[in-house]
From Swiss-Prot:
The gene is RPS13. CDD domains: Ribosomal_S15p_S13e. This is Small ribosomal subunit protein uS15. It comes from the Eukaryota. It comes from Saccharomyces cerevisiae (strain ATCC 204508 / S288c) (Baker's yeast). Component of the ribosome, a large ribonucleoprotein complex responsible for the synthesis of proteins in the cell. The small ribosomal subunit (SSU) binds messenger RNAs (mRNAs) and translates the encoded message by selecting cognate aminoacyl-transfer RNA (tRNA) molecules. The large subunit (LSU) contains the ribosomal catalytic site termed the peptidyl transferase center (PTC), which catalyzes the formation of peptide bonds, thereby polymerizing the amino acids delivered by tRNAs into a polypeptide chain. There is a cross-link at residues 39, 43 (Glycyl lysine isopeptide (Lys-Gly) (interchain with G-Cter in ubiquitin)). Gene3D superfamilies: 4.10.860.130, S15/NS1, RNA-binding. Belongs to the universal ribosomal protein uS15 family. GO terms for cellular component: 90S preribosome; cytoplasm; cytosol; cytosolic small ribosomal subunit; nucleolus.
Amino acid sequence: MGRMHSAGKGISSSAIPYSRNAPAWFKLSSESVIEQIVKYARKGLTPSQIGVLLRDAHGVTQARVITGNKIMRILKSNGLAPEIPEDLYYLIKKAVSVRKHLERNRKDKDAKFRLILIESRIHRLARYYRTVAVLPPNWKYESATASALVN
């Protein structure tokens, strides 16, 4: 996928396996994979961290193929889904760190420009999540309260 605020074309990407069935060598049941997902979520891991851990430690290629549901759906059904989507959360975290950097380095014009780009990405993503009802319709990003959202 191409980059939003740079000249990168984004040609390379990983290929998801076509097979929609669990591999023949995979021995865990879907219930045990769901238990692992819930256990890792209770420890405080994000959905992408859970996916990486399942892939590396347990050999789960795709949780959706084995369980029939995506990791986020499993977390929502167990009441463990994060209140802010993960990609939006990390954009807000990045904006908070850039703003903190700008407090110490007021003349850093490049950081000011990058902060504008980050915050426009946040506004665009928040608008999308409001339309698909992941976020409440009155949710708004404010730089003053952003550090409270991240911590």
